[in-house]
Structures are given as C-alpha cells and as structure tokens.
C-alpha cells in the first residue's frame, strides 16, 4: 500500500538529516497517515480510508459526503 493520503494526495517528500556538524544524509519525510472508518449516512455503510490527520480535519469541516463526491470525480474508488 502506497503512503499517499486518499483525501489530500499528500505523499512522502525527501530532504536531509542534519548532524550537529551540518553533515547531510538523505531521508524521507512521511505523511501522518491513519486508517479510519467513517459512517456514510447516505449510503448506510462504513467507508475505510487511509488519510492524514489534515484529511480528517477536512472531513470534519466539509462532511464525508462532499469529500467522497470529490474523490469519485478524481477517479478514486471508494
């Protein structure tokens, strides 16, 4: 399973670890992914999503029905 948020599309980015001597070694910054079940009242079922904490806040703000509609327009299977 790829480390991509289903709502926001956030994915890992690369950068550097920096030691005290400012030596650089490559590293990955991973998104804060959580697996969460949401109850969709209009469909009378649970939907399981892999999303970031920010994605959960977006669902709290807009509502699960609107977010699922936006995901389906993008071609995401839900």
From Swiss-Prot:
GO terms for molecular function: structural constituent of ribosome. InterPro entries: Ribosomal_bL28, Ribosomal_bL28/bL31-like_sf, Ribosomal_bL28_bact-type, Ribosomal_bL28_sf. It comes from the Bacteria. Pfam families: Ribosomal_L28. Residues 1-20 are annotated as: Disordered. Keywords: Ribonucleoprotein, Ribosomal protein. One of its GO terms (biological process) is translation. GO terms for cellular component: cytosolic large ribosomal subunit. Belongs to the bacterial ribosomal protein bL28 family. This is Large ribosomal subunit protein bL28. It comes from Photobacterium profundum (strain SS9). The lineage of its organism: Bacteria, Pseudomonadati, Pseudomonadota, Gammaproteobacteria, Vibrionales.
């Amino acid at each position: 399973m790829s480390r991509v948020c289903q709502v926001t599309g956030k994915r890992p980015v690369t950068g550097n670890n920096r030691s005290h001597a400012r030596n650089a070694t490559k590293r990955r910054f991973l998104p804060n992914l959580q697996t969460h079940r949401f109850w969709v009242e209009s469909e009378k079922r649970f939907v399981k999503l892999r999303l970031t904490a920010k994605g959960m806040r977006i669902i709290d703000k807009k509502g699960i029905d609107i977010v699922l509609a936006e995901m389906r327009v993008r071609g995401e299977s839900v």
